[in-house]
Amino acid sequence: RRQRQMCIRDSPSFKAIIYYRIAHKLYEGKHYFWARWVSQKGARKTGIEIHPGARIGKGLFIDHGNGVIIGETAIVGDNVTLYQGVTLGGTGKEHGKRHPTLCNNVMVSAGAKVLGSFTIGENSKIGAGSVVLEEVPPNSTVVGVPGRVVKRNNQSVPREDMNQIDLPNPVLEDIQRLQHLSLIHISEPTRHAQI
């Protein structure tokens, strides 16, 4: 009993989820002003901003939640874990569903940004500081900017699939092609003069 009281009194994450649940009920009842009022009060007190229109399942755990943002059309499944500084945001380009869907048992590490209307498959992990802009298959691990799948079903993805060092450089390729053409052009008159 004492631990529960300490949890309620001391945990900003727990308080943020309580504020969200109240605001979401108001939002579903079309009491938008009061829903936003409760939501903003919760954000000011906890540092965690959860839009009352977001749909969140059971067992959400926000660890060290300062700076967590969950957008209006985000859908969060059951038993999801979010760490500090996570954003489930939109790109601002879509109408309607603009935010991501996180399936059950997803973990999003500190500072990761998941931006856009797509799905993160169940049991997936998003690495710290990653920026995810596209669909993630179930049972995957994603890291980097932009986010790339480095593990699927607990098996590493082949290195050539995630090579970020030897990326094509179209500008350099064009310069090399032009240099080659200029060398051919320079050598042609000499060849004609010898004939």
Feature-to-residue mapping (PLM):
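C-terminal segments of enzyme domains that contribute to small-molecule binding surfaces
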Residues: 97-109, 113-114, 145-183, 187, ...
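Short, proline-centered helix/strand-breaking motifs
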Residues: 12, 135-137, 190
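Short, small-residue-biased leader/transition segments that mark boundaries at the very start
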Residues: 3-7, 188-190, 195
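A transmembrane-helix-recognition feature enriched in membrane-embedded lipid enzymes
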Residues: 2-45
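Charged, alpha-helix-enriched surfaces in structured cytosolic catalytic cores
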Residues: 17, 33, 75, 170-173
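Structural signal for interior beta-strand "rungs" in well-ordered beta-sheet cores
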Residues: 43-150
